[in-house]
Amino acid sequence: MKELKPDIYAAACPSREILIMIGEKWVCLVIGALDAQKILRFGELKRICEGVSQKMLTQTLRKLERDGLVIRTVYADKVPLKVEYKLSPLGKSLVPVLQQVKSWAEMNLSEINDNRIAFEQSK
């Protein structure tokens, strides 16, 4: 396979697609939930990630599985079918970065909220 030189600012660079995927609304929450709980079933993930629809959670998990960030294990011998999700080593390598973003958001929540209010009042 030809090695690609990443350039996040180039429209055709696959690294841009990866960054966009990581920034999607439910991706960070699903990865965070799997990091905290280690192994989860679909319904457990849906309960933890409040507000996610079944369709969006399914799409998010499929993307993460496709990209190798999540491992999906199906237990076909179980009735009803049992499916579990966990982070792959690649997914685990993303956790520290997402934890930093989470910490930054929590640390700056009040200031950003105040800025939003001031902005809206200035209109």
Label for each model-derived stretch:
Residues 77-98:
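Basic, amphipathic "hinge/linker" alpha-helix immediately C-terminal to the N-terminal HTH DNA-binding motif
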